[in-house]
Amino acid sequence: VANLKCAFGRAEVLHGVHLEVRAGEIVSLIGANGAGKSTTLMCVSRIHRQATGTIELDGRSIVGLAPQEVVRRGLVQVPEGRRIFPRLTVRENLEMGAFTRTDRAGVAEDIDRVCGMFPILRERAGQLGGTLSGGEQQMLAIARALMSRPRLLMMDEPSMGIAPMLVAQIFRTVRDVLRAQGVTVLLVEQNANAALRMSDRAYVLETGNVALSGTGTELLRDERVRAAYLGH
């Protein structure tokens, strides 16, 4: 991503953001509310079409593509607030995640695979998504996104409104299972401490600009980051 700009009406909210996510990495965007983190993800996934700049996936531009074509190229977003289909069962939600695929046998195998990552989903397979707890819905949202076999998975605030124990479980899955499977992750997360600890690299956004970047370890030790986002 290079020189990414986005405006709503006359108000520009991203002022030339540059960031890179290399294959196999976990990269985080941290920053205060309103810094432009979620907007960055929605511009990259082409949900917001007003953005200008360079956006490439595997060296190919995705600017101008419809969101569903971006999914076919291998980029998927887990939205803030989960946004599962409340009136569909867990299994039906997972099947919806594979809407770009035609290989039924492979889809069935992947349902079994993601349920292995989050065993509670197997137990709840016939239950309506809207009846799940917040943590279970977040697991379902991540599993649904994985059903498209993404190369780049973007997650927006996965810890929001979830009990700390479940947050830890979700982060362990992202760190261990997805890394083992070679899925690249771009994470937006208010829990800066947890995000930086699991990230290879991270960017700090402030009012629509990249203010700092470095490895997760470097930013955990940075006095400016510690004072602004880690409570030290």
Regions found by a protein language model. Name each.
Residues 1-232:
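Glycine-rich phosphate-binding loops of nucleotide-dependent enzymes
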